[in-house]
């Protein structure tokens, strides 16, 4: 920080910045006007031009007048002090630089250095230091020449400048500086006391670090103004900045006697702010002074520059310089204190001229102080942070060393090794290359080290991760130290289907709940049994089984419902309960388990929803993370969506919440809805299991479930769904109330369902598996090619009248491929339609159903996925384009029309080879009271005769399902264990079963290979049935053309070779395929492999560029794909290209054999993969496990 007295104007010492700035400009103008013609050259501010002029024109122009007279004119205390030192650090940075000031500053080395630091960008200061040192040395030479060359008369013409180099002037200045120094010392002592009290009061990390420093013996000499009384070595150990050649020269100059105290003086101070920011000023300024003189001045210099920003700082610096002028002979600039950019750079040549340069040295020191104080506080803060980080690192190293195997403590090592370490550092610093030093300075962004050889500075630099080593080791062990078996176990565990644990209900304490809410009205209680039977007969012939079955109701008011529920029922337009509702609602609200079987469109959904709402409202509200109370499971996603939609009118009125969870939709949304809480969940079994197993069972649970509904129960208990449904029911409390509803309920399904019920009441309305009488059923026997024409006729008749303009038509097919094909054909004929099946995305299925219900398109093509539960208004025509394969499916398909008392038509197409399905259709017609057409009856009779003769097996009702492969394997494993345990004597049968399995596997593979042969191949004698991919590979030697040979024996031999090649089993072409490898570039050996009739995946495997490139690189052969592809059953005609095949050519028989073996392996793998993908493809029209 510059003191206020440094100004050229005659203003007082305390002049302000603005007055200093103004006086300097006036002086500059005066000085410029007094220059002679030789000095009228206009100087530019650019450093390039300035350096060039200095080298070329120093003697001729004599622009740099540094004579003692001129210098003495400005040495007066009132006029010599530069005004720029009055400025604060912030104002200096933003100050304008004008030409007048530049003109003056060029005449003095001090101003030249300061202007250089201010005018350039701060980021370039360090880069230009080495170049500046070079010019500084040249400038010193010019000082001697300037003394003799400048005439004395020039100085005499300045009235404001006193005489130069007078002794009294120097004494007066020295006395004033000493007085100011004493005042500054007192102020600094008080300031340090205050800071120490604040630090002691604050405590914390700073106190701990200070204590560690004291224990380490590294307390610096800046603890007090009087702390340093020993001379300092000229080579500071803390230097890590830019390399300076003059620093090396100065390092060699000092006497070796001062090295003993170097380690004590240059150390890490306890204060981050002081030690990190100002590490090396004391050493640099006092480089070559005697120890007696430098002792006091060094301590004052360091303390003043570090801790104070006022008048005392400058006075201390002046006093120090005045005492050093008689002995310090190096007129060089010092390095900046905060950034450590420069080292003391005394030229060896100028040592003898130290007495003549003492004034210049003093001025240079003033300049150095000025530049040191010009740094920003951000740099100070950054240096302080870096010092704190180094202390943290030292603490960590101490902690690590204390836990190591007998390492010496850090404090002892640093105290013992400091002097020797410093000597090593000094030697290394002298030998360092300038480029290496510069690059290392760029690489090190942290402030320079301040340790005098302390050992902790380099303690274990390669192990910074030791702090977190335990955590990293744990992670690495978990992943990297595992065996291959662990990975296999993890992979197998991930592949397993999500499962839910079985609940032990004996260990769970469930809340009691009430089931019975129904109180029989007096008018119904007074009714006799005969009157009740007559009422059931009037209600479509209701049949009931069970003990104490309630009598059916005839009005909604008799059901014991709440006002809100009755209002919603009235708003929906339900005037009176339907047959199933009249009997099922009283039975369910009485707390009984119920099996309800009723025709399609009879209102079964409302029959189980209304009692559920009453059941839920009787229980306490849900708390956080409690599961639902009512659980409704359906077999299809569309039915789940429809039931959820039917719930919505009641949910708002009763203040309840419901969630619809089904596969295909994003599970995250369903999890979020469940976590918010829902009293009702409508779901499919597969997605329900996923939700129960998600997040270790924390998403939802079944502890609160007391009311369970299985809609379309016969399908839910079929082989496909039964394991999942039973798994879910096993996790619900045993005293739950269970309700089953369906339009069809075979006896075998009923027996299975009764195992989950407790004394159920069975309600059957209109018979089991019966089509509603409101539906007109038409069954026609037609060939496959005439069905589409008949379909167009039916659609044309439907939409021919205006009254059916808004009618809908639903067409059922057996398979997904059939649905897409029929969709394409109908759209070509101009009918707007859509298709729905299990192969489509769920969002497409949902949107298609909604659009169909809204009438956006009138025709929908669907598989049996839309056969159950779908309720569409204005649906007047159902066409079974492909006949259903069992009775229940037919009833549900036909039941999509004629709902809620409306009429409809169901048309079914049968082909002549579908005799098996005709039996169930004829049975449905008879049960619904309709006549069976004669062609259909003939088909039924023919099939029954075949059954009697044992040629056909009678079809069973129900889906039957395909079963689950995993369950079949578990049953087989259990049976095998029993056989081995009990030795039942069936071991022979076991061997026979194994042989049968092997035969089946071989037969399956032969079927795959049989698809390779052409359609006409089996009828040709002598041709193999399939290509033997594991057989012997035949490699032929390439025959060269006999140029112009007319020998008939050669032609016969060639023909015989062709015949043998065509009849070989593997590796060559079959009949009609020539071997066109007799060209000039043909290899010595060749083989062919036909791939035309293999599946597409297999052909891709052997023609893929990547696979072929690998074979070429491994074998060195040539592989060429030739021929043309022909569809299955099509043979190439005369003159056409042969079937697609691969030609392999090579120089050796072994290379061709290896290439053929690899191609056959790829072909076999591709064939098996194609067969597996076909087996995994979903079967259209079937229900899949959700």
From Swiss-Prot:
- For the region Disordered, give the residue spans: 1-236, 267-461, 954-1001
* Residues in Helicase C-terminal domain copies: 794-940
Enzyme's top EC category: hydrolase
Annotated Polar residues bias: 158-168, 272-298, 402-417
Q: Which reaction does it catalyse?
A: ATP + H2O = ADP + phosphate + H(+)
Keyword Hydrolase set for record:
yes
Which GO molecular function, any one, fits this protein according to its record? ATP binding
Feature: compositional bias, Acidic residues: 360-380, 425-434
Q: EC number(s) in its UniProt entry?
A: 3.6.4.13
Alphabetical list of CDD domains matching this protein = DEADc_DDX46, SF2_C_DEAD
Q: Name one Pfam family in it.
A: KH_12
Bias-annotated ranges (Basic and acidic residues): 24-157, 170-198, 349-359, 387-401, 963-986
Q: Which GO terms describe its biological process?
A: mRNA processing; RNA splicing
Q: Which InterPro entries match?
A: DEAD/DEAH_box_helicase_dom, Helicase_ATP-bd, Helicase_C-like, P-loop_NTPase, PRP5/DDX46/KHDC4_KH, RNA-helicase_DEAD-box_CS, RNA_helicase_DEAD_Q_motif
Location of the protein in the cell? Nucleus
**Chain ranges for the short sequence motif DEAD box as given in the UniProt record:** 711-714
User: Which spans does this entry mark as compositional bias, Low complexity?
Assistant: 8-20, 446-461
Q: Which positions does the motif Q motif occupy?
A: 554-582
Q: Which UniProt keywords apply?
A: ATP-binding, Helicase, Hydrolase, mRNA processing, mRNA splicing, Nucleotide-binding, Nucleus
Principal localization reads nucleus
What's noted about domains in the record?
The Q motif is unique to and characteristic of the DEAD box family of RNA helicases and controls ATP binding and hydrolysis.
In Swiss-Prot or TrEMBL terms, this protein is called Pre-mRNA-processing ATP-dependent RNA helicase prp5
**Annotated organism of origin:** Aspergillus oryzae (strain ATCC 42149 / RIB 40)
Task: Recall the taxonomic lineage recorded for the source organism.
Answer: Eukaryota, Fungi, Dikarya, Ascomycota, Pezizomycotina
């Amino acid at each position: 920080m510059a003191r206020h007295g440094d100004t050229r104007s005659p203003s007082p010492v305390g002049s302000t910045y603005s007055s200093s700035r103004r006086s300097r400009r006036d002086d500059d103008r005066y000085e410029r006007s007094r220059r002679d013609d030789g000095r009228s050259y206009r100087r530019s501010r650019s450093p390039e031009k300035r350096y060039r002029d200095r080298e070329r024109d120093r003697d001729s122009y004599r622009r740099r007048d540094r004579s003692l007279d001129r210098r003495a004119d400005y040495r007066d205390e009132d006029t010599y002090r530069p005004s720029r030192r009055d400025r604060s650090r912030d104002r200096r940075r933003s100050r304008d630089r004008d030409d007048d000031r530049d003109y003056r500053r060029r005449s003095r080395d001090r101003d030249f250095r300061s202007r250089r630091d201010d005018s350039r960008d701060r980021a370039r200061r360090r880069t230009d230091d080495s170049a500046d040192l070079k010019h500084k040395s040249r400038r010193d030479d010019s000082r001697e020449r300037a003394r003799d060359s400048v005439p004395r008369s020039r100085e005499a013409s300045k009235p404001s400048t006193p005489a130069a180099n007078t002794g009294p002037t120097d004494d007066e200045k020295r006395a004033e500086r000493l007085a100011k120094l004493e005042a500054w010392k007192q102020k600094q002592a008080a300031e340090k006391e205050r800071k120490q009290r604040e630090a002691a009061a604050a405590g914390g990390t700073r106190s701990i670090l200070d204590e560690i420093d004291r224990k380490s013996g590294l307390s610096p000499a800046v603890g007090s103004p009087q702390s340093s009384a020993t001379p300092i070595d000229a080579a500071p150990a803390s230097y890590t900045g830019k390399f300076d050649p003059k620093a090396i020269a100065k390092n060699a100059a000092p006497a070796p006697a001062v090295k003993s105290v170097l380690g004590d003086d240059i150390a890490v101070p306890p204060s981050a702010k002081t030690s990190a920011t100002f590490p090396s000023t004391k050493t640099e300024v006092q480089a070559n002074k005697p120890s007696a003189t430098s002792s006091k001045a060094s301590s004052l210099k360091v303390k003043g520059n570090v801790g104070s920003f006022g008048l005392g700082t400058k006075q201390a610096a002046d006093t120090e310089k005045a005492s050093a002028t008689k002995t310090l002979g190096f007129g060089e600039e010092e390095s900046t204190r905060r950034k450590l950019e420069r080292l003391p750079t005394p030229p060896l040549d100028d040592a003898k001229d130290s007495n003549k340069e003492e004034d210049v040295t003093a001025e240079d020191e003033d300049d150095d102080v000025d530049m040191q104080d010009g740094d920003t506080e951000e740099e100070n803060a950054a240096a302080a942070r870096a010092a704190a980080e180094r202390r943290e690192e030292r603490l960590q190293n101490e902690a690590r060393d204390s836990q190591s195997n007998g390492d010496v403590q850090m404090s002892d090592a640093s105290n013992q090794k400091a002097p020797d370490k410093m000597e090593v550092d000094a030697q290394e610093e002298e030998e360092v290359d300038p480029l290496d030093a510069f690059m290392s300075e760029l690489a090190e962004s942290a402030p320079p080290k301040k340790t005098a050889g302390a050992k902790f500075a380099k303690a274990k630099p390669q192990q910074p991760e030791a702090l977190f080593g335990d955590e990293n080791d744990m992670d690495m062990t978990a992943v990297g130290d595992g065996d291959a078996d662990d990975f296999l176990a993890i992979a197998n565990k991930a592949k397993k289907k999500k499962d839910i644990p079985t609940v032990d209900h004996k260990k769970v304490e469930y809340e009691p709940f009430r089931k019975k809410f129904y109180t029989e009205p007096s008018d119904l209680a007074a009714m006799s049994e005969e009157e009740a039977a007559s009422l059931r007969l009037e209600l479509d012939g209701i049949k009931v089984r069970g003990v104490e079955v309630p009598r059916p109701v005839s009005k909604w008011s008799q059901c014991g419902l709440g006002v809100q529920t009755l209002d919603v029922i009235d708003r929906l337009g339900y005037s009176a309960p339907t047959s199933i509702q009249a009997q099922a609602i009283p039975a369910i609200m009485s707390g009984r388990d119920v099996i309800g079987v009723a025709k399609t469109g009879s209102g079964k959904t409302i029959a189980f929803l209304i009692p559920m709402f009453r059941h839920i409202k009787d229980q306490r509200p849900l708390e956080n993370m409690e599961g639902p109370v009512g659980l409704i499971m359906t077999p299809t996603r569309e039915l789940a969506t429809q039931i959820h939609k039917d719930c919505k009118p009641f949910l708002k009125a009763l203040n309840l919440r419901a969630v619809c969870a089904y596969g295909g939709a994003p599970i995250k949304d369903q999890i979020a809805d469940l976590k918010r809480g829902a009293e009702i969940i409508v779901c499919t079994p597969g997605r329900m299991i996923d939700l129960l197993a998600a997040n270790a069972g924390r998403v939802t649970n079944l502890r609160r479930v007391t009311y369970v509904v299985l809609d379309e129960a016969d399908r839910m208990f079929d082989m496909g769904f039964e394991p999942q449904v039973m798994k879910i029911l096993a996790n619900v409390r045993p005293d739950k109330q269970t309700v089953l509803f369906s339009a069809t309920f075979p006896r075998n399904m009923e027996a299975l369902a009764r195992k989950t019920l407790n004394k159920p009441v069975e309600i059957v309305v209109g018979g089991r598996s019966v089509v509603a009488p409101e539906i007109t059923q038409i069954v026609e026997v037609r060939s496959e090619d005439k069905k589409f024409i008949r379909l167009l006729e039916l659609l044309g008749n439907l939409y021919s009248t205006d009254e059916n303009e808004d009618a809908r038509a639903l067409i059922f097919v057996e398979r997904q491929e059939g649905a897409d094909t029929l969709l394409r054909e109908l759209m070509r004929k101009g009918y707007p339609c859509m298709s729905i099946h299990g192969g489509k995305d769920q969002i497409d299925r949902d949107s298609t159903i909604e659009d169909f219900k809204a009438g956006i398109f009138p025709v929908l093509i669907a598989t049996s996925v839309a056969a159950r539960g779908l309720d569409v208004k204005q649906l007047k025509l159902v066409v079974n384009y492909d006949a259903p394969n069992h009775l229940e499916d037919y009833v549900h398909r036909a039941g999509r029309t004629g709902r809620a008392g409306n009429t409809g038509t169901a048309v079914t197409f049968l082909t002549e080879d579908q005799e098996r399905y005709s039996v169930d259709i004829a049975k449905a017609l008879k049960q619904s009271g309709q006549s069976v057409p004669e062609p259909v009856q003939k088909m039924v009779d023919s099939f029954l005769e075949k059954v009697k003769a044992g040629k056909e097996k009678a079809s069973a009702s129900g889906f039957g399902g395909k079963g689950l492969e995993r369950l079949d394997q578990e049953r087989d494993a259990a049976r095998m264990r029993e056989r081995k345990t009990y030795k039942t004597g069936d071991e022979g049968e076991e061997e026979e079963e194994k042989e049968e399995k092997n035969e089946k596997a071989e037969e399956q593979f032969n079927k795959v290979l049989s698809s390779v042969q052409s359609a006409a191949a089996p009828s040709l004698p002598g041709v193999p049935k399939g290509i033997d991919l594991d057989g012997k590979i035949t490699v032929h030697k390439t025959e060269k053309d006999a140029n112009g040979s007319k020998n008939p024996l050669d032609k016969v031999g060639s023909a015989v070779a062709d015949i043998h090649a065509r009849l070989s089993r593997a590796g060559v072409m079959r009949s009609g395929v020539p071997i066109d490898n007799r060209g000039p570039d043909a290899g010595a050996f060749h083989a062919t492999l036909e791939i035309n009739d293999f599946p597409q995946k297999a052909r891709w495997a052997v023609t893929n560029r990547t696979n072929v490139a690998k074979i070429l690189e491994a074998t060195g052969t040539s592989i060429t794909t030739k021929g043309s592809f022909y569809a299955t059953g099509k043979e190439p005609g005369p003159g056409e290209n042969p079937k697609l095949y691969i030609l392999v050519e090579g120089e050796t028989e072994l290379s061709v054999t290896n290439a053929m073996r690899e191609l056959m392996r790829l072909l076999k793998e591709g064939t098996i993969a194609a067969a597996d993908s076909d087996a995994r493809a979903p079967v259209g029209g079937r229900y899949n496990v959700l």
